Amino acid sequence: MSTANPPADLVEMWTDGACKGNPGPGGWGVLMRYGSHEKTFFGGDPQTTNNRMEILAVVEGLRALKRACTVVIHTDSQYVMKGMTEWLPNWKRRGWLTADKKPVKNAELWQLLDAQVARHEVRWQWVRGHNGDPGNEMADMLANQGVASVARN
C-alpha cells in the first residue's frame, strides 16, 4: 500500500498455498506485518488441493488477528482474488451454486473466508508469484514448510 499516512491499525499480510500433487499433501503460509512487528506461521493437510491451501492461508491469517484491522492481503492466487472480489456475491445470491447450477467448489472454505473478511477492512493486492516479491517468497517458503510438516516420505 502506498498511502502517505497509512491507518494506525494497518496489517499487511502475504499468503500462499502449496501442494505436492494436486490432490496431495499441501501447506499454507502467512507472513504478517504490523508496524515493526512481524509474525510467520504455517500449517498443512496430508490430502488436499492447492486451491484449498490458498484459501486456508488467508482464513488462518485473518483468524490470527485479535481485533478488527485494516488489512492489505497480498496473494499470488487469482483464484482467491477473483473469488473474493468477483465471484462471491453471485455465489451467495445463488445459494452457493455456480452459474451452471453446480455446487461451488470449496464452499465451506469460502464461507469461512467470507466470515473472516467481514471482521476487517480488507484490501486485496495481487502479486506475481515467484517473481522476487520478498513477502510472497517468504509466504511460499512457509507454505512449503506446511507441506513438509504433513508429507509422507
From Swiss-Prot:
Enzyme kind, highest EC tier: hydrolase
Record flagged with keyword Cytoplasm: yes
Reaction catalyzed: Endonucleolytic cleavage to 5'-phosphomonoester
Localization per Swiss-Prot or TrEMBL: Cytoplasm
Cofactor requirement: Mg(2+)
UniProt-recorded Gene Ontology molecular function terms: magnesium ion binding; nucleic acid binding; RNA-DNA hybrid ribonuclease activity
Keywords: Cytoplasm, Endonuclease, Hydrolase, Magnesium, Metal-binding, Nuclease
Record: residues binding Mg(2+) 2: D16, D140
SUPFAM superfamilies in UniProt: Ribonuclease H-like
Record GO biological process: DNA replication, removal of RNA primer
Gene3D superfamilies: Ribonuclease H-like superfamily/Ribonuclease H
E.C. no: 3.1.26.4
Record's cofactor remark: Binds 1 Mg(2+) ion per subunit. May bind a second metal ion at a regulatory site, or after substrate binding.
UniProt-annotated binding residues for Mg(2+) 1: D16, E54, D76
Physiological role: Endonuclease that specifically degrades the RNA of RNA-DNA hybrids.
PANTHER family: RIBONUCLEASE H1 (PTHR10642:SF26)
Family stated for the protein in its record: Belongs to the RNase H family.
Name this polypeptide is given: Ribonuclease H
Originating organism: Bordetella avium (strain 197N)
Encoding gene per record: rnhA
